[in-house]
């Protein structure tokens, strides 16, 4: 995979940095694994805006990705690596020995023709999925479940991974890329290796139009609004906030922690580094 620096033929091209997709499949996705995806534009069922700065963007079909990996003992052959417009990671189309095809998150180094396996007897090889109790301590893992059988919820983005630190009783300690250490049940499954497309962090959009294609609308600063529209608004000429930064509804922002989930607090051994 290569990084493409665009020639400065226009202001939008000047700062753009793209990621090469030459190694990805060029054809259409596997139709039985596609679902329609409708734009909500940040509105709820009443038509009220619940998420600001959403709307427009290119239409995409949703690719149904297998996050459970529960076909134990059945080898799967990787047919191709594909681009997925709905996520930063690439996806791989695998065909099981019984003929079923599924999409999975593509780990780094996976190529067409490779054979993957799931279950407690699977070898320790990139792309194989095992219960955490069967994974050696110190291994790099991704697509980690938080509850057994629920499907992967952690380390699914491009270039992400976690490290298995230790096992104590029925729980294991896993360190995330953020530095946070969590306790996860040893019956939860994880996939060996790290997620592919690690160069995604080097991408530079270059112009606002790319953001619009992604369905993200402009963000207006509160200090340029009127007092009726934002707590930071008003004043003669160019002024600052005049107070601690808040959102349009007066809630503290810029670093104010809002997490309040006592039910899962006990599973966090150490918080991420700020």
UniProtKB/Swiss-Prot annotation:
SUPFAM superfamilies noted in UniProt: Nucleic acid-binding proteins (SSF50249), Translation proteins SH3-like domain (SSF50104)
Record key words, sorted: Ribonucleoprotein, Ribosomal protein, RNA-binding, rRNA-binding
GO cellular component terms listed in the entry, alphabetical order: large ribosomal subunit
InterPro entries, per database record: NA-bd_OB-fold, Rib_uL2_dom2, Ribosomal_uL2, Ribosomal_uL2_bac/org-type, Ribosomal_uL2_C, Ribosomal_uL2_CS, Ribosomal_uL2_dom3, Ribosomal_uL2_RNA-bd_dom
Cystine pairs: none
Summary of subunit composition and partner proteins: Part of the 50S ribosomal subunit. Forms a bridge to the 30S subunit in the 70S ribosome.
Protein name from the UniProt record: Large ribosomal subunit protein uL2
Taxonomic lineage of the native organism: Bacteria, Pseudomonadati, Pseudomonadota, Betaproteobacteria, Burkholderiales
Gene label: rplB
């Amino acid at each position: 995979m290569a990084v493409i620096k665009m020639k400065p033929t226009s202001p939008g091209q000047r700062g753009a940095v793209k990621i090469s997709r030459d190694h990805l499949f060029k054809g259409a996705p596997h139709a039985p694994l596609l679902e329609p995806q409708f734009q909500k534009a940040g509105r709820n069922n009443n038509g009220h805006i619940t998420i600001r700065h959403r709307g427009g963007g290119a239409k995409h079909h949703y690719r149904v990705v297998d996050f459970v990996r529960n076909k134990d003992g059945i080898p799967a052959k990787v047919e191709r690596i594909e681009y997925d417009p709905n996520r930063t990671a690439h996806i791989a189309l695998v065909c099981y020995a019984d003929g079923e095809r599924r999409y999975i998150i593509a780990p780094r180094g996976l190529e067409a023709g490779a054979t993957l396996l799931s279950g407690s007897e699977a070898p320790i090889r990139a792309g194989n999925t095992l219960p955490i109790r069967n994974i050696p301590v110190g291994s790099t893992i991704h697509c980690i479940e938080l509850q057994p059988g629920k499907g992967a919820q952690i380390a699914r983005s491009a270039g992400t991974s976690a490290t298995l630190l230790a096992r104590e009783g029925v729980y294991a300690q896993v360190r995330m890329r953020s530095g946070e250490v969590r306790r996860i049940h040893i019956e939860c499954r994880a996939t060996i290796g790290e997620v592919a497309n690690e160069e995604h962090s080097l991408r530079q959009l270059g112009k606002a139009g790319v953001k619009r294609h992604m369905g993200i609308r402009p963000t207006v600063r509160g200090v340029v609004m009127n007092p009726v529209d934002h707590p930071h608004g008003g004043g003669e000429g160019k002024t600052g906030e005049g107070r601690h930064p808040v959102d349009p509804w007066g809630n503290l922002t810029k670093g104010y922690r809002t997490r309040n989930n006592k039910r899962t607090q006990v599973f966090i051994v150490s918080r991420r580094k700020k």
